[in-house]
Structures are given as structure tokens and as C-alpha cells.
Amino acid sequence: MFVKGLEKVMDIVRSVTVDQPVERVFTYLSDFTTTTEWDPGTVRTTREVGDGGVGTRYRNVSRFLGRETELVYVVEDLSPNERLRLRGENQTVVAHDTLSFMPNADGSTTVTYRAQFELKGLARLAAPLLAPAFRRLGNEAEQGLRGALERL
């Protein structure tokens, strides 16, 4: 966790390397509805508008600390086989999710997943107490991501 201005930001970064070509990994993860298959907190993700490219809007419902929360995500950047960046928001948080893809010489792919959560309003005050839960969320997402990508 770090402080950005007056806002508390939770920053989770995880990398996984899987024995899959970058094209297959990117195609799978650039469809954000697949979060239901690899993000243990996701209850459902639906695409509302768009074809998956920049400007596409997704509605994500997740369970965090026993409560369901809904964020609307928009694809801000999509560079095939290199990067996918989305921004999600609701009344208490702004989320920035970035997935970076690196093809390796042996044909495997390394995916780096960075999730930044900027808490808003009174939720900022709880940031120090939420840090362990966000770390756990990152660990669970890493395991889910690795498992889903290995099954491709």
C-alpha cells in the first residue's frame, strides 16, 4: 500500500509464467468475462457495450470480505499480445487493472497482472485495515490465473 496524494492506493502485482503461446494467453485474458474462471472473487462479469477493444464496457460483480460489490470496467488500452488496461469504478473505489504479456524464448508466456485500487470517501480511512485482505486477494488471483492459463 502507498499514499498517492491524499488517497490510499492498494497496489497488487503478480506474475505467472505458463507454457502457452502469448497469442493464446492474450486472446483468453483480453476477454474480461473470463475473470469468472480465474479470479476467485468474481461472481460474474458481463460485457455491456463494445467488441472487446478500447471503449468496451464490462460489469463485474465480485465478493470481497463477504460482501458483493459491483464495478463498471472500461477498456482503456489494448495492444495485442502486449498489454490490456482497464479502469473500473463504483462509489467507493477506482480500480486500474493492467495485464502485461511477455513471450519467452522457449514459447512460454509471462503475464504480469497489476491491480491498483484507489479508495474513495470514508473507505480511505479503512485502507490500513484492508491491506491484508488485498494481499490475500492478489495471492488467490495469482493461483487462479496460473491454473486457468495452464488449462488452455
Feature locations, PLM:
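Beta-strand/loop substructures that line and gate deep hydrophobic ligand-binding cavities in soluble
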Residues: 87-140
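Short, intrinsically disordered, mixed-charge
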Residues: 27-34, 40, 135, 139, ...
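Non-catalytic surface loops within mature trypsin-like serine protease
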Residues: 20, 49, 64, 103, ...
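Hydrophobic ligand-binding cavity/cleft-lining segments
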Residues: 1-47, 53
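Glycine-rich portal/gate segments that line the openings of hydrophobic small-molecule binding cavities
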Residues: 46-92, 110, 140-152
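Hydrophobic/aromatic beta-strand elements that line small-molecule binding cavities or substrate pockets
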Residues: 14-16, 62, 71-77, 88, ...
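A short, compositionally biased micro-patch
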Residues: 19, 38, 78-79, 104
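Hydrophobic/basic alpha-helical segments enriched in Actinobacteria
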Residues: 12-14, 31, 38-46, 67, ...
